[in-house]
């Protein structure tokens, strides 16, 4: 497994040695320094860049998704290899499926791989599974993203119960494995990515049997910048997810906090070591 730590723009040096990156469309649209950094990263051999559509950030801010046509231009600015197709939290699966059928060919025509995020309305687990099944079997899709929002939504536990939220993606992966859909995805050459992190880094340990290829999160760096250290509790974060939204322009002058962020990154890097290595 490859892990994509995400850093605020003034601290991109923290992630410069990664071989896999997840970039964010809403930052690429506004920050030339950000784009220039990832243009340089693309020159490194065997570096992979997934450009997210910033759907999580736009949803939390109550803003609409980027138009797919604009995503192509932004992906070129950061030299991305894959584009996350627009996804729609708390919407029926067919909305995202229709967009995938419409826009995946255009993304491929421009030379990008395609990344699909299954979604459903809150409480509709079967529709979320249907959405995954579409991606697992459709040749238009290269990558499948397991969302930090979609899965807790499907189990009605996105807010108010950290334990249920922490376990929700583990439960979902077991469900699709039992139905043969995870194997179907692997048989069809799909890559599996985990988007974000919920209530502690030890979620990684729960997922080690599922053949996850890549995972991203800003949790290690952002928690560290705010004085929160990953710990030896069962989840790795005794009080659960640090809920304050990431400020991607934050400049941290206190070196103690920067070192704490590095400690948290090392905690995750040690967890992923040896998982699904090829």
Task: Kindly label every feature range from the protein language model.
Residues 1-110, 276-277:
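Non-catalytic, usually N-terminal nucleic-acid engagement modules in DNA/RNA processing proteins
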Residues 1-10, 69-72, 176-192, 200-278:
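Alpha/beta catalytic cores of nucleotide-metabolism and tRNA/nucleoside-modifying enzymes
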Residues 18-23, 46, 79-80, 110, ...:
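Glycine-enriched alpha-helix->loop->beta-strand junction motifs that scaffold or abut catalytic
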Residues 25-26, 86, 147-149, 218:
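Conserved residues at the C-terminal ends of beta-strands
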Residues 52, 116, 207:
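Terminal peptide-recognition signature
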Residues 64-67, 92-99, 162-169, 174, ...:
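Residue-level preference for long, well-ordered alpha-helices that form the structural scaffold
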Residues 70-73, 98, 102-106, 130-134, ...:
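Alpha-helical scaffolding segments of alpha/beta enzyme cores, especially the outer helices
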Residues 113-195, 199-203, 219-243:
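Glycine/Thr-rich beta-alpha phosphate-binding loop at enzyme active sites
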């Amino acid at each position: 497994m490859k892990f994509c730590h995400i850093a605020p723009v003034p601290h991109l040096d923290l992630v410069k040695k990664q071989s896999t990156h997840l970039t964010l469309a809403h930052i690429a649209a506004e920050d030339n320094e950000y784009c220039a950094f990832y243009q340089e990263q693309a020159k490194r051999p065997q570096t992979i860049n997934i450009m997210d559509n910033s759907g999580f950030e736009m949803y939390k801010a109550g803003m609409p998704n980027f138009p797919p046509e604009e995503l192509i231009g932004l992906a070129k600015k950061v030299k991305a290899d894959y584009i996350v197709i627009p996804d729609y939290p708390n919407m029926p699966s067919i909305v995202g499926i229709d967009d995938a059928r419409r826009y995946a060919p255009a993304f491929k025509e421009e030379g990008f791989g395609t990344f699909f995020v299954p979604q459903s309305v809150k409480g509709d687990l079967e529709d979320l599974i249907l959405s995954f099944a579409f991606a697992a079997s459709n040749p238009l899709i290269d990558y499948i993203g397991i969302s930090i929002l979609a899965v807790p939504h499907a189990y009605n536990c996105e807010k108010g119960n950290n334990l249920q939220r922490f376990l929700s993606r583990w439960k979902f992966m077991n469900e699709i494995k039992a139905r043969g859909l995870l194997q179907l995805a692997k048989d069809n050459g799909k890559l599996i990515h985990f988007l974000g992190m919920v209530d502690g880094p030890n979620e990684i340990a729960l997922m080690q049997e599922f053949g996850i290829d890549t995972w991203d999160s800003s949790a290690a760096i952002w928690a560290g910048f705010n004085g929160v250290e990953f710990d030896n509790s069962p989840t790795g974060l005794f009080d659960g997810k640090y809920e304050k939204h990431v400020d991607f322009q934050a400049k941290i002058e206190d070196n103690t906090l920067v070192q704490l962020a590095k400690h948290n990154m090392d905690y995750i890097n040690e967890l992923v070591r040896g998982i699904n290595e090829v």
